[in-house]
UniProtKB/Swiss-Prot annotation:
Protein's job: Presumably involved in the processing and regular turnover of intracellular proteins. Catalyzes the removal of unsubstituted N-terminal amino acids from various peptides.
Cofactor note: Binds 2 manganese ions per subunit.
GO terms assigned for molecular function: manganese ion binding; metalloaminopeptidase activity
Matches recorded under PANTHER family: CYTOSOL AMINOPEPTIDASE, LEUCINE AMINOPEPTIDASE-RELATED
Enzyme Commission designation: 3.4.11.1, 3.4.11.10
Protein name as it appears in the record: Probable cytosol aminopeptidase
Pfam families, alphabetized: Peptidase_M17, Peptidase_M17_N
GO biological process: proteolysis
Cofactors (names): Mn(2+)
SUPFAM superfamilies, per database record: Macro domain-like, Zn-dependent exopeptidases
Length: 499
């Protein structure tokens, strides 16, 4: 994983040189330590704010070069907006805004982590630091030449001045590991498909062993013995063999029931024989965003030594249209024994998940399962790119996911499920079809998956709109977002981890 910015904490009284960042509210007020640090430069801030109509709105910035009265060569004021409305994840965004204003220079960066109400808490200062790292991430390793004006990599040392350095470091340590997990997920989603095919993906997931994660890789013969006919049917059209990877972190009590996360990992999706249009097909390298999230999450949980037992499982395939490819009209038998008529070979992700969900439910018997998948285009029609679709057979799990989404800014929206939708998958020749009618596509996909979880509490997150190609934000300028890592880490930490 690239590490392009170094973030640390220093005492509040540290003298600022290079670039100085400070925060104000929507009344252009500063905290006492900030006022002291600015000294007579506060007058320059007032003049510049009036000239540029800077109002301190959340995320807005005021940039002043060589401010009189400061040793800093540059002063950047970041608006925090109305303090009464600020939420925990807003500090992450403030860190992202900060990183976006550092620029390509090599000057030292000092940040006074203070609002008008006083110094930020250790957790808030840590969130600012995490936001800096998340915004700084960039995927450009395959560019050998840079165009004129193209952004240069951010290579800076950022010192965040806080009231209690030790407490800030302690608060940042687990957040830093979560950011590592987010960046790992982004890296996987951004990689080209000729580099990240199923075997290579499995190899990278296996590197989690260094953190104490148990990793088992099921190859094609092993999956055949397990009768994973749904997954193998998708994979059979590719020269790249499929894999299923089972990751196990045992941070909880010995023998305690684990929680489980399952990810769809279609490393490239042409649609198969039901081939996709050529426009934007290159984006289908990201059809493994769910699997990327699960690997990033397992990294985060293991690195911060989460006190919980966790199973992470990913099904890895390519969906290709060669002479051995699955056909519309084929009937496959899933690991559960249920038979599936293939109506559309481009409805392949649910086939991969069907076998992996069943495997995890029966072998590991988790407290709950959450699966993540870039499953349907229909979810973008319904929710756009701001929310992931949430489907579940368990109200408590849904409520907790929703609350974790609100806390992290990785939001979910629950959509309906019900037996009325099942008839849309009735098949004349098999137990079910793999695709329903045109309408309610995200719902029927979830109804399909529910048939493979038995009585296990389960939630399905359709992340087709949030995992890749979503609009750039204050904390992500990358095509791959790493969506879901922070959401699920927060779910585990708030509700299931031993205290």
């Amino acid at each position: 994983m690239p590490d392009v910015v170094n973030v640390g904490f220093v005492p509040m009284a540290t003298s600022a040189r290079g670039v100085l960042f400070v925060f104000c509210d929507d009344a252009l007020k500063f905290g006492p330590d900030t006022v002291k640090a600015l000294g007579t430069a506060a007058n320059a801030v007032k003049r510049a704010a009036a000239t540029s109509q800077f109002k301190g709105k959340s995320g807005s910035t005021l940039d002043i070069l060589a401010p009189e009265g400061l040793k800093a060569v540059r002063l950047v004021v970041i608006g925090a907006g109305k303090l009464a409305a600020i939420k925990d994840h807003d500090f992450l965004k403030l860190g992202g805004v900060l990183a976006g204003k550092i620029g390509g220079g090599k000057e030292a960066v000092t940040v006074i982590a203070e609002l008008p109400t006083g110094a930020m808490t250790p957790a808030q200062g840590a969130a600012v630091a995490a936001g800096v790292r998340m915004r700084a991430y960039k995927f450009d390793r395959y560019k050998t030449k840079k165009k004129d004006g193209e952004d240069t990599p951010l290579n800076a040392s950022v010192a965040i001045a806080v009231r209690d350095v030790a407490a800030a470091k302690k608060a940042f340590a687990p957040q830093n590991h979560v950011v590592d997990g987010v960046i790992m997920a982004r890296e996987l989603v951004n990689e080209p498909p000729n580099v990240l095919f199923p075997v290579e993906f499995a190899r990278r997931a296996s590197q989690l062993r260094k953190l104490g994660v148990g990793v088992e890789v099921l190859d094609v013969p092993a999956m055949k013995r397990l009768k994973m006919g749904a997954l193998l049917g998708v994979s059979q059209g590719s020269t790249q063999p499929g894999r299923t990877v089972i990751m196990r972190w045992n941070g909880g009590k010995k023998g305690e029931q684990p929680v489980a996360f399952v990810g769809k990992g279609v490393c490239f999706d042409t649609g198969g024989i039901s081939i996709k249009p050529s426009g934007s097909m290159e984006d289908m390298k990201g059809d493994m965003g769910g699997a990327a999230c699960v690997v990033g999450l397992m990294h985060a949980l293991a690195a911060r030594k989460a006190k919980i037992n966790v199973v992470g499982a990913i099904g890895l395939v390519e969906n290709m249209p060669d002479g051995n490819a699955q056909r519309p009209g084929d009937i496959v038998t899933s690991m559960s024994g249920q038979t599936i008529e293939i109506i559309n070979t481009d409805a392949e992700g649910r086939l991969v998940l069907a076998d992996v969900l069943w495997y995890v439910a029966k072998k590991h018997k988790p407290k709950f399962m959450v699966d993540l998948a870039t499953l349907t285009g229909a979810i973008l029609v319904a929710l756009g790119t701001e929310y992931a679709g949430l489907f579940s057979n368990n109200d408590q799990l849904s409520e907790r996911l929703t609350e974790a989404g609100q806390a992290t800014g990785e939001r979910v929206w629950r959509l309906p499920m019900g037996p009325e939708y099942d008839k849309m998958m009735d098949s004349q020749f098999a137990d079910m079809k793999n695709a329903g009618a045109r309408h309610g596509g995200s719902i029927t996909a979830a109804q399909f998956l529910q048939r493979f979880v038995d009585d296990t509490p389960w939630a399905h997150l359709d992340i087709a709109g949030t995992a890749m190609g979503a609009p750039k934000t204050d904390i992500n300028q990358s095509w791959g977002s790493g969506y879901g890592v922070r959401l699920l880490d927060r779910l585990v930490a708030d509700y299931y981890e031993s205290k």
